[in-house]
Amino acid sequence: MDWKIELVAVPVTDIDRATEFYTRIGFVADHDQRVDETLRFVQLTPPGSACSICIGQGVTDMEPGTQTGIQMVVPNADEALAHLTSVGVEAKGVDDLAWGRFVYFNDPDGNAWALQELPDYSRLDEWREEHGVSL
């Protein structure tokens, strides 16, 4: 049996501002539904992903800005950093680690994201030697 993550809730203060932010960085706004006066659900999907995020009113009990540890895989960390900065997002990186190359950014509410370029595992021993890391 396959188990696949479908949605991750991201708590925000301003739904429209967050929707604009995520679409500006490349997410697709799949759904924007107001069910009633207490529930509005916006589903946004990163390019190439089968998993989406949802933002809105009444979708999570988390406080805005408290979602951390969301990580996406990108083909090239340098290009991802360049893209984010080109659309006005403050991002930091590229951090070169044995387990990948990372770029970090926050959404307007402070929810923290990491983008990971997967390493060439065939070069892991070389990386460890260059960085003085032993097992």
Q: What positions do the PLM features span?
A:
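Core segments of cupin and vicinal oxygen chelate
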Residues: 2-3, 9-51
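Short, solvent-exposed beta-strand edge segments and adjacent coil->beta transition regions
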Residues: 3-7, 65-69
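Vicinal oxygen chelate
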Residues: 7, 32-33, 40, 81-135
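Short hydrophobic/aromatic beta-strand micro-patches
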Residues: 9-11, 71-75
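Short amphipathic alpha-helices within nucleic acid-binding modules
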Residues: 21, 78-83
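Short, charged/polar surface micro-motifs in flexible loops or helix N-caps
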Residues: 47-51, 60-62, 76-79
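Short, charged/polar, Gly/Pro-enriched secondary-structure boundary elements
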Residues: 49-53, 110-113
